[in-house]
From Swiss-Prot:
Key words of the record: Cytoplasm, Methyltransferase, rRNA processing, S-adenosyl-L-methionine, Transferase
InterPro entries per UniProt: DNA_methylase_N6_adenine_CS, Mtase_sm_N, rRNA_ssu_MeTfrase_C, RsmC/RlmG, SAM-dependent_MTases_sf, Small_mtfrase_dom
Entry's EC annotation: 2.1.1.172
Short name of any one Pfam family annotated for the protein: MTS_N
Name of the protein in question: Ribosomal RNA small subunit methyltransferase C
Domain of life: Bacteria
CDD domains: AdoMet_MTases
Localization annotation: Cytoplasm
Annotated source species: Salmonella newport (strain SL254)
Keyword rRNA processing: yes
Subunit details: Monomer.
Record-annotated membrane-spanning stretches: none
Family named by the database record: Belongs to the methyltransferase superfamily. RsmC family.
Length: 342
C-alpha cells in the first residue's frame, strides 16, 4: 500500500480541516492513509485482516481487527471517517455498530467511489447523522454530517441463515454469497466425492459452506478454514457449530497464518479487492499451495472461465485438469508432484 486510493486523495484535499481532529478510520481501508494522515490522534477499526496487517505495522495497538468495534476502539475520538465498501449491507452493519459507540455531536465523514453506491449513505444515515455532500472529485463523493442520534446496535439481529441439502449455513453482512449458495461454489461442491479423508484446508471460506458440505458426507476429514474477513470467520464458526461439525477457523491473508501441510486445499478465490479487479489473491493461493500440500496432495479451485488460472497452475505445478465446467465457471484440479515449483 504505497499509492493512495481515489477516496483517500479526495480526503487529502481537505487535510487542513482535520489537524485538530481525533479520528477513527473505518470501512474499506485499502491504503495506509489512516497511519499517515495529519491529525491530533488517529485510530482505525477494520474487519479485513490484510488491511490490519498493513496498518498495524505503523499504528500498532491503535488499529484493531474484529467483527465489531468496541467502546475502546472509539475512545476519545470526535470524528469518524468511513470508507464506503461496495457491499451496502456491510456498510450498514459497520456504521450502525460504530455510530452506536461514538458520542453525540461527533463529525461523520463518508467517502467512496460513486460506482460503489456511496450516495446511499445519505438515506442510510438520515435519522442519525444527516449528510451533505462537501466534495466530488476522482469519481468519488465526500459527505459530512454530525451525529445527532446514536443508533441501537445488536449483533444478534444481523445474523441470517439459509439451508442447503440439510445443512444450516449461517451468514453475516459482508460474507460472500450471504443470501444463498453461489453458482461457482455449487459447481465445486459437485466435484467433492464422499468418503474424502485427510487434512483439508478451505481458503477464503466465506460462510463455511464448502467445508460443511464436505464434512457432512466425509466425516473423517480434518477441517481447517481461513479467510481475511472477520464476518466470514465468525460465520464459518457458526455454520460448523450449527451442523455439529468440527474444524479450526481463523483469520489469515491467504496462507499468512497457515501452518503445516494438507492433503487437499479447496477454494473459490476472490478476484476483486474492493471495487478493483485483482488476481493477486488467486496467484498467491496457487503459488503458495506448493508449500502447504503433502506429496500427492491436491489443489482444487473454482473460477470464472475467463480468468488466466491455467497458465499459473501450469507454471507452478506443471499441469492442471478441468474436472467440471459450465459456460461461466471451471473447476481446476492439480496435484503436488516432484515437478511442482517449491
Amino acid at each position: 500500500m504505497s499509492a493512495f486510493t481515489p477516496a483517500s486523495e479526495v480526503l487529502l484535499r481537505h487535510s487542513d480541516d482535520f489537524e485538530q481532529s481525533r479520528i477513527l478510520f473505518a470501512g474499506d481501508l485499502q491504503d495506509d492513509l489512516p497511519a499517515r494522515f495529519e491529525c491530533a490522534a488517529s485510530r482505525a477499526h477494520t474487519q479485513q485482516f490484510h488491511h490490519w496487517q498493513v496498518l498495524s505495522r505503523q499504528m500498532g495497538d491503535n488499529v484493531r481487527f474484529s467483527l465489531v468495534a468496541q467502546a475502546s476502539d472509539v475512545a476519545d475520538c470526535d470524528t469518524l471517517i468511513y470508507y464506503w465498501p461496495k457491499n451496502k449491507p456491510e456498510a450498514q452493519f459497520q456504521l450502525m455498530n460504530i455510530l452506536s459507540l461514538m458520542p453525540s455531536g461527533s463529525d461523520v465523514f463518508v467517502v467512496g467511489e460513486n460506482r460503489s453506491g456511496v450516495r446511499s449513505a445519505e438515506q442510510m444515515l438520515a435519522d442519525y447523522a444527516p449528510l451533505n455532500k462537501v466534495d466530488s472529485a476522482r469519481r468519488c463523493g465526500l459527505y459530512h454530517g454530525r451525529l445527532e442520534k446514536q443508533p441501537q446496535f445488536s449483533l444478534e439481529s444481523w445474523w441470517a441463515e439459509y439451508n442447503i441439502d440439510g445443512l444450516t449455513i449461517k451468514t453475516l453482512p459482508g460474507v460472500f454469497s450471504r443470501d444463498g449458495l453461489d453458482v461457482g461454489s455449487q459447481l465445486l461442491l459437485s466435484t467433492l466425492t464422499p468418503h474424502t479423508k485427510g487434512k483439508v484446508l478451505d481458503v477464503g471460506c466465506g460462510a463455511g459452506v464448502l467445508s460443511a458440505a464436505l464434512a457432512s458426507h466425509s466425516p473423517k476429514v480434518r477441517l481447517t478454514l481461513c479467510d481475511v474477513s472477520a464476518p466470514a470467520v465468525e460465520a464459518s464458526r457458526a455454520t460448523l457449530a450449527a451442523n455439529g461439525l468440527e474444524g479450526e477457523v481463523f483469520a489469515s491473508n491467504i496462507f499468512s497464518e497457515v501452518k503445516g501441510r494438507f492433503d487437499m486445499i479447496i477454494s473459490n478465490p476472490p478476484f476483486h479487492d474492493g471495487m478493483q479487479t485483482s488476481l493477486d489473491a488467486a496467484q498467491t493461493l496457487i503459488r503458495g499451495a506448493v508449500r502447504h500440500l503433502n506429496s500427492g496432495g491436491e489443489l482444487r479451485i473454482v473460477a470464472n472461465a475467463f480468468l488466466p488460472y491455467p497458465k499459473i497452475l501450469d507454471e507452478t505445478f506443471g499441469f492442471h485438469e478441468v474436472i467440471a465446467q459450465t459456460g461461466r465457471f471451471k473447476v481446476y484440479r492439480t496435484v503436488m508432484t516432484r515437478q511442482a515449483k517449491k
